[in-house]
Amino acid sequence: MKCPFCGYSESKVVDSRSTEDNMAIRRRRECLECSKRYTTYEKVEDIPILVIKKDSSREFFDKSKVINGLIKSCEKRPVSRQQIEDIASDVEKSISNQMVTEVKSDAIGEMVMEKLKEIDEIAYVRFASVYRQFKDINTFMEEILNLVNKK
């Protein structure tokens, strides 16, 4: 691995440990030429997952899109950035664990909503209103009533 500071290709590992989620190994390295330290991560290469959109087009799963949707839904709500990232990671992990190469966008939306419902109901309703594309106030109210009745 090349040193990001001087480009030298040899280094020694100073420290090595698993990340919190045990999905990668964090290595602290020291360049043998300039002695500067830097961090690398080693993880299993993921199989790319294709998302089948509502119009039947396909695109690669992008965790940042899930995070951005959650950020909009959780705006001005007591939901931390870490909780948002945890939801996105849980959804990504759940899809990977299914060992599929394609997943419908509907399934992703449902997974996000289930996780969001546990954390903040207002953010859940906001996400659902965009995801489910409510046509009028009645369908919006039905969703809220379903949420209230499930308590």
Curated annotation (Swiss-Prot):
Q: HAMAP family under this entry?
A: NrdR
Q: Does the keyword Signal apply?
A: no
InterPro entries xref list: ATP-cone_dom, NrdR-like_N, RNR_NrdR-like
User: Which PANTHER family does UniProt cross-reference here?
Assistant: TRANSCRIPTIONAL REPRESSOR NRDR
In terms of domain of life, where is this protein from?
Bacteria
Q: What GO molecular functions are on record for this protein?
A: ATP binding; DNA binding; zinc ion binding
What is the required cofactor set for this protein? Zn(2+)
Q: Where are the zinc fingers (unnamed)?
A: 3-34
> Would you tell me the protein name for this molecule?
Transcriptional repressor NrdR
Q: Which UniProt keywords are listed?
A: ATP-binding, DNA-binding, Metal-binding, Nucleotide-binding, Repressor, Transcription, Transcription regulation, Zinc, Zinc-finger
Q: Which GO terms describe its biological process?
A: negative regulation of DNA-templated transcription
- Species this chain originates from: Clostridium acetobutylicum (strain ATCC 824 / DSM 792 / JCM 1419 / IAM 19013 / LMG 5710 / NBRC 13948 / NRRL B-527 / VKM B-1787 / 2291 / W)
Function per UniProt? Negatively regulates transcription of bacterial ribonucleotide reductase nrd genes and operons by binding to NrdR-boxes.
Q: Which family does it belong to?
A: Belongs to the NrdR family.
Q: Bound how, and how many: what does the cofactor note say?
A: Binds 1 zinc ion.
ATP-cone domain boundaries = 49-139
